[in-house]
Amino acid sequence: FMMSGYFVGYFIGAATIPMIISQVGHIRVFAAFASLASLVILIHSIIISPFVWFLLRVLTGLSMVCIYTVAESWLNDRSSNKNRGSVLSIYMVILYGSLGIGMFFLNFSTPKNFQPFILVSVITSAALIPILLTKKKPPTFKSIKAMKLRELYNASPFGMVSSLFYGTIQSALFTLLAVYASSMNFSILELSLIHI
C-alpha cells in the first residue's frame, strides 16, 4: 500500500510537469522538486505512520518524475540526432547504477536510525548545486502539446504496449522485491545484491 503512493505521485507528475516547466522553467522546477524530495525524505524519519508514509511516497513520486523529466529533456535538447541514443544510454546506466549502488547503503546503518534518511537528503540536496550554478541556458520549447493515448498508440503500438508491460513489471519489482526478500529471511547484503 505505502509503496504504491510513489507511482500515484509519478502519474500525477507526468500529467502536470510539462505545464509547470513551461510556466517557470527547467532550473526552478528541478530546484523546487529536488528540495521537496529532500524535505520529504527527512519527514519519513520523523513520522512513522503507514498513511503518512503513503502521502510522502506520493510526494516522492511526484518529485522524482519532475526531476527525471527536467534532466531527460535537458539532455535531449543538448544532444543531436547522431549522439542522442548514446547520451541517453549513458544517463540510464548512471541512473540505474546509482539506484543499485544506493541499496548497499542499507548495510551501513539500520533504517531505524536517522542516518540513512539524512544521507539520502544530503545527496538529493547536493544534486541542486550543478544545476543552480550552471552558466548553460536551459532548454526552451515553444509549445508543449500532450499526445492523447490513442495518438501515442497509433504512432507506436509496440512501444506503448511494451512500455506499459515494462512499467508494470518494474513497479512490482521496485515495490515488492524487498518484502519478498524479507519474508524469505534474506540478509541486508543479499537484499542489496538482488536489487542490482
Question: What spans do the regions from the language model cover?
Answer:
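Structural signature of the two symmetry-related core transmembrane helices
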Residues: 28-42
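Conserved small/polar residues in nucleotide/adenosyl-binding loops
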Residues: 194-196
